[in-house]
Design a protein with these regions (language model features):
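Catalytic core of membrane glycerolipid acyltransferases/transacylases, capturing the structured
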Residues: 88-148, 171-187
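Alpha-helix N-cap/helix-start and coil->helix boundary motif
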Residues: 47, 79, 99-102, 126, ...
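Short polybasic/polar patches that bind polyanions
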Residues: 25-29, 111, 138, 198, ...
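Generic structural "secondary-structure junction" signal
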Residues: 18, 63, 74-76, 101-104, ...
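Soluble or luminal CAZymes and related metallo-dependent hydrolases
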Residues: 19, 74, 146, 236-239
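Non-catalytic C-terminal accessory region of glycerolipid acyltransferases
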Residues: 37, 41-44, 83-87, 112, ...
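Membrane-anchoring hydrophobic helices of lipid-metabolizing enzymes
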Residues: 1-96, 130-135, 141
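Hydrophobic alpha-helical segments typical of transmembrane helices
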Residues: 23-26, 105, 132, 192, ...
Length: 268
């Protein structure tokens, strides 16, 4: 698998130069304190990770449960958080970013936890690839919810023991977003996670999936307590966004830099 990934890296990084301009600009603006040499090193390591991630995701179609849990494991404290929520018969929301191998993290959760995992996603326009992604994500029991149906489906599932996962680092429409500084840039953040959590009073668990070595990841979890009342909108959003920012700074090569995350300008 990883010999193939090394070949794909040469193709993607050196020959096709896939989104090199977007990645370089994102890195330079996110880390103004780093030298050009340091930026290039992060960029190269990112493309190696990106190629590994691409092939690891397809490996989901054939990997066994035993091997899945071996390659993407829970920290003991992480398992304890999920087990305690199950004992309390408490559904909750998962917040995470495009960091590490989020697909494998979802697989391991579905294998190891009592909660039924639902993942919020955008259906792809290409029916073939949408079907392929659906098979990969649901192979170990995970279920998918289209983003437009999120609140409705969560309310319909309130009698069940569920965990609903949100990827929080996508790019919302600027006039409906919460704006804050993220990686040294003015950034729109989804407020929907915070609004839903407060509406249905579900706990939030922030998850990070750290790359330990090539092909191996460890899942860390932290429970974010909901305040009884908010003095201002955005408090919870800022908490989980700062957690992600800290994770990215600690392992900058393991975040998805190919996205045009900062394509929107703050409305005046």
């Amino acid at each position: 698998l990883y010999l193939l990934s090394d070949g794909v890296y040469i193709l993607m990084y050196h020959l096709i130069r896939y989104r090199r301009g977007v990645v370089r600009l994102n890195l330079v603006r996110s880390f103004p304190e780093k030298t050009q040499k340091e930026i290039r090193e992060i960029e190269s390591r990112f493309y190696r990770y990106f190629c590994d991630l691409f092939l690891e995701t397809f490996k989901t179609l054939t990997i066994s449960k035993k091997s899945m849990v071996k390659h993407c494991s829970f920290q003991p404290e992480t398992q304890a958080i999920f087990d305690q929520l199950a004992v309390e018969n408490q559904s909750f929301m998962v917040v995470m970013g495009h960091f590490g191998n989020w697909e494998w993290g979802g697989n391991t959760f579905s294998i190891c936890c009592r909660h039924q995992l639902y993942v919020i996603y955008h259906p792809l326009s290409n029916k073939y690839f949408n079907g392929l992604v659906y098979r990969m994500r649901t192979r170990f029991g995970t279920r998918l919810i289209a983003m437009k149906d999120t609140l409705r489906d969560m309310l319909n599932n309130r009698s069940a023991l569920t965990a609903t996962a949100f990827i929080a680092d996508q790019s919302p429409l600027p006039d409906r977003a919460y704006w804050m500084s993220f990686l040294n840039q003015d950034t729109p953040i989804f407020l929907g996670i915070e609004k839903i959590a407060l509406k249905i009073r579900y706990p939030i668990v922030y998850i990070t999936i750290r790359r330990v070595k090539r092909g191996y990841y460890t899942v860390f979890a932290e429970r974010i307590e909901l305040p009884l009342s908010l003095q201002r909108s955005g408090t919870i959003t800022e908490i989980h966004t700062r957690r992600l920012e800290s994770d990215i700074r600690s392992q900058p090569e393991n975040w998805l830099w190919t996205h045009r995350r900062w394509k929107h300008q703050r409305p005046k």
